[in-house]
Amino acid sequence: MKNFKQLLVMFLGIFLFACEDDPAEVVEIVVTPPATYTFERDGQSTVSFSGQSARLEMAAELGTWLNTPMKTAAELDAMFNDGTGFGNPALAASGKKLGNKTASSSIASSTVKPQFDALIVDVTSNVFPNVANDASAGTPGTYTDPGGRTVIINGKGHEINQLFIKGLMGALVCDQIIWQYLSTGKLDGGTNVADNDAGTLVDGKSYTTMEHYWDEGFGYLYGLDTDLNTAEVEGGSSGGDVLVSKYMNKVNTSSLPGISQEIYDAFKHGRAAIVAGAYDVRDEQAEIVKTKLSHIIGRKAADYLKSGADKIDDGKWADAHHALSEGWGFILSLQFTKNPDTGSPYYSNAEVNSMLADIDDFWTVAPADLRSMATSIESKFGF
């Protein structure tokens, strides 16, 4: 009997040791994204991005007024920094603003937001008072190509509304999506992971904080879309968003075919991963969004530089000023992209400022230099 007890103890010890030695079973979470960006809880939609829709609408109207010599600097400043003075009274009532979300992430240089404020001063002090004058090198005013485009520009040929709006492509949209709402620091901040795992909802809402942050990132691209059931942003090309979704549509049918679907699918997949608690999948999809958005910025920066060079060669100066003004804004935006190989922007703030200085005077910049800069951008992005 004594020997039996000893054998039993030895057997139990070996059994327990073997159990402890077995590796814990890893349960893989399978994430199945929905066909459309539709997510519900208890019959209620959990998707909300009204603040982003408001800011996109603000940007569209502000862009119009920056090219219409009727507003004062104070009025334009109020629209940008205070969120007031818009034709739609609901925008002011929303409490949302563009200025406080412009170049506001931790990677943004503190010098960028003042550049936008300076553009408001420039257009109201130099351009608007001189629209009755014929523009020329060093002289602000209006320039019209024979039988073609008309632009109102400063003495360097800058069409201010284009610099401003194209600059918001990066300083607002990419900065908010890439460096804030889809960043792990934002998504996983505080108790967000534990709350999402437990299904703890924001007070009075149908969504968790993590779900909402992801949706807000989504909203900076799709906030004015009239049909979220497709990858195409229906409001992005006419009468809707004037920011990144408009140019996503453009490159989707030309130089970056299929990019709209890739971004839309990644947003859907990442949001489904949040619902499932599969944060590794979420992060993989976030990186797809960040890389593809960055490619849009890089592609258009190069495109407008080349277009500007071609228009100068053709003697179409109004077209050249317009294209280079758009290019200026997209170059400014390069510092808000993300290179997946380095985890940093494709271009630093210092590099961007150097590039802007090189093309500063649109009347005198050499087409060869514009094409060289475009080629350099294409090379860095791997186009």
Feature annotation, model-predicted:
Residues 2-10:
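Sec-dependent signal peptide recognition
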Residues 8, 25-26:
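Detector for intrinsically disordered, low-structure N-terminal pre-sequences
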Residues 20-23:
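Bacterial signal peptide processing site
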Residues 26-383:
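Mature extracytoplasmic or organellar-lumen-exposed domains after removal of signal/transit peptides
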